């Protein structure tokens, strides 16, 4: 199991996702990695605060990171996520820290 302290940020994750890092530092917190899912050539690490860190499996570098919505949570846990994580994801969404898939569709981003 990976730990967040053992990972390093890529340029993309550190500079281009600085807005997300600020929200995580100020409001959500980093937490601990509770699940690792391997697909598309990299690990998607879920933390207990509702974050997903996309990590390169060979170099242990964080490629990108995002805050989960409920749709992604159910995908990661095969429609059986733990209750505490559902509550945390709902808390993040209700505070506006997550742009949900539906909101992105309305804004024309997808």
List each model region and its residues.
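Ribonuclease/tRNase effector modules and their secretory precursors
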Residues: 1-110
């Amino acid at each position: 199991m990976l730990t967040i302290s053992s990972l390093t940020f890529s340029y993309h994750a550190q500079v281009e996702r600085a807005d997300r890092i600020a929200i995580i530092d100020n409001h959500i917190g980093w937490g601990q990695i509770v699940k690792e899912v391997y697909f598309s050539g990299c690990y998607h690490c879920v933390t207990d605060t509702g974050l997903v860190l996309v990590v390169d499996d060979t170099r242990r570098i964080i490629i990108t990171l995002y805050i989960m919505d409920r749709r992604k949570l159910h995908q990661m846990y095969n429609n059986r996520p733990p209750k505490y994580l559902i509550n945390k994801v709902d808390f993040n969404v209700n505070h506006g820290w997550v742009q949900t898939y539906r909101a992105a569709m309305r804004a024309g981003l997808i």
